[in-house]
Curated annotation (Swiss-Prot):
Protein name: F-box protein At3g19880
Annotated organism of origin: Arabidopsis thaliana
Name of one Pfam family that matches: F-box
Residue ranges annotated for the F-box domain, each copy included: 2-49
Top-rank taxon: Eukaryota
InterPro entries, per database record: F-box-assoc_dom_typ1 (IPR006527), F-box-assoc_interact_dom (IPR017451), F-box-like_dom_sf (IPR036047), F-box_dom (IPR001810), SCF_F-box_component (IPR050796)
S-S pairs: none
Amino acid sequence: MTMMSDLTQDLVEEILSRVPITSLGAVRSTCKGWNALSKERILCIGEPKQQFLGFMMLDYRLCSMRFNLHGILNEDFVSISMYQVETSQVFYCAGLLLCVTREKSSRLIIWNPYLGQTRWINTKTTKTGYNTYALGCDNNKNHKILKVFCDDYQCYYEIYDVKSNSWSAFNVTDPNWHIDYDICALVNGNTYFLTKERILVEDSDEDEDEVETPEILICFDFTAERFGKFLHLPFQFDIDFGDTGGLSCVKEEKLAVLLKRYDQNVIEIWVTTKIEPNVVFWKPFLKVDIETVLGALLDFQLDSFFIDEEKKLAVVFSSNKSKCYKTAYIIGEDRYLKEVDLGECKPLRSPIVCFSSYVPSLVQINQIAVPKRRENKRKRKSKGKGREV
């Protein structure tokens, strides 16, 4: 009879590479050897071969994803507790996910898929209007949530500290920028947003008019808990004029930016050689005339993308103009590799693919216990209400 200890390490690694992300925790209890190998995977010592691990959104539900050059290998819906939650947005940082619920009040859930732990978080304010979120961490690896409110003339943001279970509020005085897209990416614990700068110019009547620049970058530094200065992109483009642009992280260490101009069928991708909250340098990664390999994509609408630096490939997710049908294109330099039909999906605010190259985390995020004094007070109130009825 063959024992688990008799299996070769290569075979065990192959088995572990096929284990759903959300089941890795159970694997560790199988035997000491498997426990050690799964720990290596957590610490990025042994990475899955030739595939990306991540999560994707299907009809407001979060599911795990494996993607390689042959396409999507499997779509496993996550734990029952998360499957019951309709999610509108998902953000990722260092093994944890932030899920924004689809309900009107937009509650927050922070989730560790590996440990199977979740924490529901009450938001601090009832401010209405456009807002966006991000999940990051400071230099001490403490996870934090950013909630940003922007309108034409002001910016207000709140920060939730996962470790202390507390919110803080901040104002940006007279911002000359605003964030009105959910286009952002996480690098080294900080979030980089696409934004626009406002500039005052004099017209022919010597009156001042406000104009906006094409897209630029701005970083939110989770250690300093503030926005940095403007960062340049390797090219100019303007989403308001029909250009398509997107951001993606590369193993949480580099930033990639994609461009497709409204009047061209060329996809251009650049990646950073250095990036910090106040400095960035770029190099070209990939430039493909998609008309020569796919034909004219008149209905191309960028949803999200990620890259494989070693193979010099990009996986670009697109939706049609109705945002109901999703397609993944695996493309390389001057050649088309594969097209994967993802089927019909409901329109989402969050990209269909949340991120790739997921790495499990051992960070504990169990629901914060309610202090006994507060719990007893709540019970007394509940009993009182019962008597009144």
